[in-house]
Amino acid sequence: MRNTSKELQGATHRYAPCDWYYHVPVKRSEKAVDAPPASQIPGLSNLGDSHSENLPGTRRYWIKETDSEYVKLAKQGGRPDLLKHFAPGTRKGSPVAYSLPDWYIHHSKPPTASQQEVRAVSMPDYMVHEEFNPDQANGSYASRRGPFDFDMKTVWQREAEELEKEKKKLRLPAIDSKYLSKAGTPLGPKNPAGSRLSFPPVPGQKNSSPTNFSKLISNGYKDEWLQQQQRADSDKRTPKTSRASVLSQSPRDLEGPQDAARLQDAEASEGPEDTPESSQSPEESVSASTPAELK
């Protein structure tokens, strides 16, 4: 905060300090001052030894107003038997042992040794084995359960219970063949196989060899498929080309009875429209096929 009232006093005091901000320390005196004692408790510091004056005179200035009650008591030498407890009425005598107050115990007079109950030492229940006595057992007796093993039955008891459960199961009577003959045959198709449902085979489910991944990655299956397509196309084209080649051969080129028989088979395979032409003799067919200039 700026104090404007002191700005006009001069350039050196332009920014005067605020009185409320901090306290200006008092100027220190240049006189020698004795160092304070290391401890104010008597016997723990050399304050009494350093002075040459009489001890009672020096102890007079040990106690200060700023000292606490405990420090003042310690400087005076303390109180004798400060931590001892004196029973009421015996304060002037010798100190006695600490006695319990009346409010600390439940009864005013503690029981004597003869009145105290003798505690019986007993083992825990899970460490004591007691034989079962049916005479002493009541109707509400229940055997104790073990801490770990919860199966209280023997092997023979368990087998007997399982046999009883199997006997109690509901069993249907056996089917007699006499009743089946009296009831007659059920209505329906005679062929039992016809009544079964049959589904067509799903495409793609063939019992083939497992997939070869190296062949799959290198497009080997693709090449096989293309080769199969080419073979199928070539098989479709071969009968047409063989038939055309047989028909294009002339009787002069035919050698032997095999070629003649092949020509007759090719002519017979033609449709009914070509029957009149096929009825002609080989000489007429040859003359018809030759041009007029060569005749």
Swiss-Prot record:
Q: Could you tell me which residues belong to the region Disordered?
A: 33-52, 180-295
Q: State the coiled-coil residue ranges.
A: none
Can you say what this protein is called?
Uncharacterized protein C7orf57
Q: Which keywords fit this entry according to its UniProt record? A: Phosphoprotein
Q: Where is the composition biased (Low complexity)?
A: 277-289
Q: Matching Pfam families, A to Z?
A: DUF5524
Q: Where Phosphoserine occurs, residue numbers?
A: S50
Q: InterPro entries in the record, alphabetically? A: DUF5524 (IPR040247)
Record carries keyword Transcription regulation: no
Q: Which organism is it from?
A: Homo sapiens (Human)
- Comp. bias intervals (Polar residues): 205-217, 241-251
Task: Identify the taxonomic lineage of the organism of origin.
Answer: Eukaryota, Metazoa, Chordata, Craniata, Vertebrata
Which residue stretches does the UniProt record annotate as biased composition, category Acidic residues? 267-276
